[in-house]
Amino acid sequence: MDEIESRIDPEIEDDFRRQWSDFLHHRFTGDIFSPKRRQKSASSLPRRDVRINETLDDLEAMLYAQLLNVSDALESDNKNLSVRANYGTGILSSVLGAELFILPDACNTLPTTRPLAGQGAIERLLERGMPSLTDGLGSRVFSAGELFREVFARYPKIEKYVEIYHPDLQGPLDICELMWGEDLFLSLIHI
């Protein structure tokens, strides 16, 4: 954390954010928007590889893996400084009751969920009403966000310049497909 804090240059990051703000507020006048960090900042520390499956049950490993992304961004000229609770596309479907599907560690791929067993299972899900947002992966997502905020609060530049953005929640049709399975598309045709 100290090393990342020392590598963040407020002048450089303010300029980088200004470029994004200009684009957002229609002040960009070029042909193709491609923000550039004026100066890269290389890490001097060794890195430990973190496997995705390791991060799923270990908040410290999740934080470390996300900070590796921040370190990489500081070494690039165009990446935003950001972290997220990185639990894959099955976050909301797990909150709704779908079983988590974790691939073997060798795949180093984010988890997803298995579909429920047909239309009847979907109907029972709807009858149960609103689930708790801490069901499934929900509690891990909230815990990761809380840890990020707690740790970042001790580092003023990290707190200011490293954005905590929302996890991969997917859209409504994606969630329906995760819950129903590929039969969803045939069911839509036969309605």
Predicted segments — roles?
Residues M1-C107:
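N-terminal basic, low-complexity leaders that serve as flexible interaction/assembly modules and, when applicable
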Residues I4, D135-G138, E150, D174-M179:
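Metal- and O2-centered redox machinery and metal/ROS homeostasis
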Residues L67-V70, V141-F152:
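Generic structural signal for well-ordered alpha-helices
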Residues K79-A85, K160-D168:
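Hydrophobic faces of well-ordered beta-strands that scaffold small-molecule active sites
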Residues C107-E146:
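A gly/proline- and charged-residue-enriched helix-loop-helix capping module
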Residues V151-Y161:
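Catalytic cores of enzymes that engage adenine nucleotides and/or redox cofactors via long glycine-rich
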Residues I164-L186:
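A short mid-domain helix/strand-loop element embedded in enzyme catalytic domains
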Residues I189-I191:
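Conserved small/polar residues in nucleotide/adenosyl-binding loops
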